[in-house]
Amino acid sequence: MFSMMNGLQHYGQQALRAARYIGQSFMVTLEHMNRLPITVQYPYEKIIPSERFRGRIHFEFDKCIACEVCVRVCPINLPVVDWELIKSMRKKQLKSYSIDFGVCIFCGNCVEYCPTNCLSMTEEYELATYDRHELNYDQIALSRLPFSIVQDSTIQAHSSLGYLS
């Protein structure tokens, strides 16, 4: 008789614990029902990245002194810098500069350590192509200014998503 009472008491405690867990999960569900949706209809609505976002690298050819600091600080030695030495002036002249964004890890070391600030990170994040060789940007493609989401009237920009800031 005593073991039956213990079993019944244990069963009652388990039932109360299960009801408490169900109540807690129901409260979490109700809390999430009051939140705004975070899904964005991507091609028509775009999120404005934060100021610290690391997007495509912008390059200014005229400022570069071909010091190759960007190549030395890059963890994967990615930027390809071609230069020639002008013996009369004892100075390097930049011939070409390219970055393969298919390999780039967007760490930002090249931008941070550049002594002339000829490199900068943009807010451009749409780099998708059908051919991976199109991701190899030369100095002309790198110097192209990024297209701003805010200026496009056909796209609705979202900046109110707090988790991306």
UniProtKB/Swiss-Prot annotation:
For this protein's source organism, the top of the classification is: Eukaryota, Viridiplantae, Streptophyta, Embryophyta, Tracheophyta
Tell me, in one coarse class, where this protein mainly resides. Answer: plastid
Q: Name the positions where [4Fe-4S] cluster 2 binds.
A: 74, 104, 107, 110
* Gene Ontology MF: a single term: 4 iron, 4 sulfur cluster binding
Q: Where in the cell is it found?
A: Plastid, Chloroplast thylakoid membrane
Q: Which Pfam families match?
A: Fer4_7
Entry keyword annotation includes GTP-binding? no
Give the family from UniProt: Belongs to the complex I 23 kDa subunit family.
Give every 4Fe-4S ferredoxin-type domain span: 55-84, 95-124
GO term, biological process aspect, one: photosynthesis, light reaction
Report the InterPro entries cross-referenced here: 4Fe4S_Fe-S-bd (IPR017896), 4Fe4S_Fe_S_CS (IPR017900), NADH_quinone_OxRdtase_chainI (IPR010226), NDHI (IPR004497)
Q: What is this protein called?
A: NAD(P)H-quinone oxidoreductase subunit I, chloroplastic
Xref: Gene3D superfamilies = 3.30.70.3270
Q: Which UniProt keywords apply?
A: 4Fe-4S, Chloroplast, Iron, Iron-sulfur, Membrane, Metal-binding, NAD, NADP, Plastid, Plastoquinone, Quinone, Repeat, Thylakoid, Translocase
Question: How does it associate, per the subunit comment?
Answer: NDH is composed of at least 16 different subunits, 5 of which are encoded in the nucleus.
Where do the annotations place [4Fe-4S] cluster 1 binding? 64, 67, 70, 114
Q: What class of enzyme is it?
A: translocase
Q: Which reaction does it catalyse?
A: a plastoquinone + NADH + (n+1) H(+)(in) = a plastoquinol + NAD(+) + n H(+)(out); a plastoquinone + NADPH + (n+1) H(+)(in) = a plastoquinol + NADP(+) + n H(+)(out)
Q: What binding details are noted for the cofactor?
A: Binds 2 [4Fe-4S] clusters per subunit.
> What are its E.C. numbers?
7.1.1.-
User: What cofactor(s) does the depicted protein rely on?
Assistant: [4Fe-4S] cluster
Domain of life per record = Eukaryota
Source organism (scientific name): Psilotum nudum (Whisk fern)
